[in-house]
Amino acid sequence: MDSNTVSSFQVDCFLWHVRKRFADQELGDAPFLDRLRRDQKSLRGRGSTLGLDIETATRAGKQIVERILEEESDEALKMTIASVPASRYLTDMTFEEMSRDWFMLMPKQKVAGSLCIRMDQAIMDKNIILKANFSVIFDRLETLILLRAFTEEGAIVGEISPLPSLPGHTDEDVKNAIGVLIGGLEWNDNTVRVSETLQRFAWRSSNEDGRPPLPPKQKRKMARTIESEV
């Protein structure tokens, strides 16, 4: 196993522990708590994949961080912070919408890279909107936290979420996953539109209905992909 992979996991475990202590003092805002919950799932998945104990990794990560801090001057810290581009956290969904449990009458699921696409194929003839919480850097989607499809009545009928065991995805990965979700939902004559925030940062062009321009042929191909691969 690559030593950098192990040490990266150890540092991530310790930094998560620090953030958890911060949250336990009721100091974190909603985006902070949301990322904390998502990162916990990711660390569990990575720990299982690597065969590493999280508690042991956290202790090792603490030693690594302490060693770095001992060598770090205040001036170097200021320069590092100034050179790192700041990302923004954007929210279409409330915390309740993100944390709400939902179930599917006719579940369909597809894994696309490090993203999991789920939808209820029992839903027909509905008006559906896609909402997402994600971070943005350089005016482009950086990291998807969670995307969900809602009917006008507020029911959840679809979802795109990162796989905890496979961290890391690009804005193109997210765009392709959204295309698959839209294609699957539209296969049952649902009308799908996308939130303005997601339109702006997930891709640069959309039609007047608030969704990316997908030709009918591509929509049919995407829907068949879901049918054949699930």
From Swiss-Prot:
Annotated region described as RNA-binding and homodimerization, given as residue ranges: 1-73
Organism domain of life: Viruses
Entry's Gene Ontology molecular function annotations: protein serine/threonine kinase inhibitor activity; RNA binding
Sequence motif Nuclear localization signal, residues: 34-38
Location of region: Disordered: 205-230
Localization per Swiss-Prot or TrEMBL: Host nucleus; Host cytoplasm
Keywords from the named record: Eukaryotic host gene expression shutoff by virus, Host cytoplasm, Host gene expression shutoff by virus, Host mRNA suppression by virus, Host nucleus, Host-virus interaction, Inhibition of host innate immune response by virus, Inhibition of host interferon signaling pathway by virus, Inhibition of host PKR by virus, Inhibition of host pre-mRNA processing by virus, Inhibition of host RIG-I by virus, Inhibition of host RLR pathway by virus, Interferon antiviral system evasion, RNA-binding, Ubl conjugation, Viral immunoevasion
One Gene Ontology cellular component annotation held by this UniProt entry: host cell nucleus
UniProt keyword Lyase, yes or no: no
Modification after translation, per record: Upon interferon induction, ISGylated via host HERC5; this results in the impairment of NS1 interaction with RNA targets due to its inability to form homodimers and to interact with host EIF2AK2/PKR.
Alphabetical list of Gene3D superfamilies matching this protein: Influenza virus non-structural protein, effector domain, S15/NS1, RNA-binding
InterPro entries for the chain: NS1, NS1A, NS1A_effect_dom-like_sf, uS15_NS1_RNA-bd_sf
Secretion signal, residue range per the UniProt entry: none
Region (PABPN1-binding): 223-230
Region (CPSF4-binding): 180-215
Motif placement: Nuclear export signal: 137-146
UniProt remark on domains: The dsRNA-binding region is required for suppression of RNA silencing.
Biological function: Inhibits post-transcriptional processing of cellular pre-mRNA, by binding and inhibiting two cellular proteins that are required for the 3'-end processing of cellular pre-mRNAs: the 30 kDa cleavage and polyadenylation specificity factor/CPSF4 and the poly(A)-binding protein 2/PABPN1. In turn, unprocessed 3' end pre-mRNAs accumulate in the host nucleus and are no longer exported to the cytoplasm. Cellular protein synthesis is thereby shut off very early after virus infection.
Record's subunit section: Homodimer. Interacts with host TRIM25 (via coiled coil); this interaction specifically inhibits TRIM25 multimerization and TRIM25-mediated RIGI CARD ubiquitination. Interacts with human EIF2AK2/PKR, CPSF4, IVNS1ABP and PABPN1.
HAMAP family: INFV_NS1
Family: Belongs to the influenza A viruses NS1 family.
Protein name: Non-structural protein 1
Organism: Influenza A virus (strain A/Turkey/Minnesota/501/1978 H6N8)
Gene designation: NS
